[in-house]
Regions:
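A hydrophobic alpha-helical transmembrane-helix feature that marks the membrane cores
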Residues: 1-247
Length: 247
């Protein structure tokens, strides 16, 4: 069975086996995932340090890197280059720049005494990833078509909500409770983190099927890219949750 992922970087048709002898492997996908995460980390550390020295850069970096990363992600998903590593590497760096600036702003401006919040969010993200990997490995949750359909619908709804919130932000307001630190706001963050965690199961399933059905070697990059997209989203949601709990 080929599962339909809610992650556009892991679309099923990308993982069809080709006529060449170079095939997608799990080790190759893991290595490429680690490479992209390393670039995200480098970008994050650079922007965090830059914003710490000049806080006025925070919003500029967030907007510039956020928009740049969005454009590159769309380019990768629409163009589908045979050698996507350059665009994906550029995306990872920009995403890292965004995360670094965002993390600094949350730690130093959203909270008073927010020291340690970034480490807590990182630990939480790693814990969720390892938990879902274990759950997937032992077949506790399987990415069946019905499961993927539900997750896809939830992810789509969340993205629409964020888009609507962004539009409202342009007019000086936001969706009620979305960013609040009360019980409803915390509950929303927990729901979003749960959906992101379930999306990891979908991504694991798609990558496994790519390896199983002999997808082309360059699909390792797409598998890694999709996984990094999910992990970045998970970290951002985890950081928001920890901030709300500490507020």
């Amino acid at each position: 069975m080929v599962y339909r992922s809610s992650n556009p970087a892991l679309a099923p048709h990308l993982f069809q086996g080709g006529a060449t002898t170079e095939r997608m492997t799990l080790d190759g996908t893991v290595n490429k995932t680690l490479a992209l995460l390393a670039l995200v980390s480098i970008g994050a550390m650079f922007s965090f340090s830059a914003v710490a020295q000049n806080p006025a850069l925070g919003m500029l970096i967030m907007i510039g890197a956020g928009l740049g990363g969005f454009v590159l992600a769309i380019a990768v998903l629409m163009i589908r280059p045979n050698n996507p590593q350059i665009l994906m590497s550029m995306y990872a760096i920009l995403e890292g720049l965004f995360i670094g600036a965002f993390s600094y702003m949350i730690e130093n401006y959203y909270l008073s005494g927010g020291e340690g919040i970034i480490l807590q969010a990182l630990v939480g993200t790693v814990a969720v990833f390892l938990t879902m990997l274990t759950v997937y490995k032992f077949g506790i949750i399987k990415p069946t078509e019905k499961f993927v359909l539900v997750v896809s619908s939830l992810v789509g709804a969340i993205m629409i909500l964020y888009l609507f919130n962004f539009i409202l932000y342009l007019f000086g307001t936001t969706v009620p409770f979305l960013h609040s630190s009360g019980p409803i706001g915390i509950g929303i963050s927990v729901i979003f983190i749960t959906v992101a965690a379930l999306m990891l199961i979908v991504d694991f399933g798609m990558i496994e099927n790519g390896v199983k059905f002999g997808a082309h070697k360059n699909m390792e990059w797409y598998g890694a890219f999709g996984l990094v997209l999910t992990l970045v989203w998970l970290y951002i949601e985890m950081l928001k949750l920890v901030a709300k709990l500490r507020d």
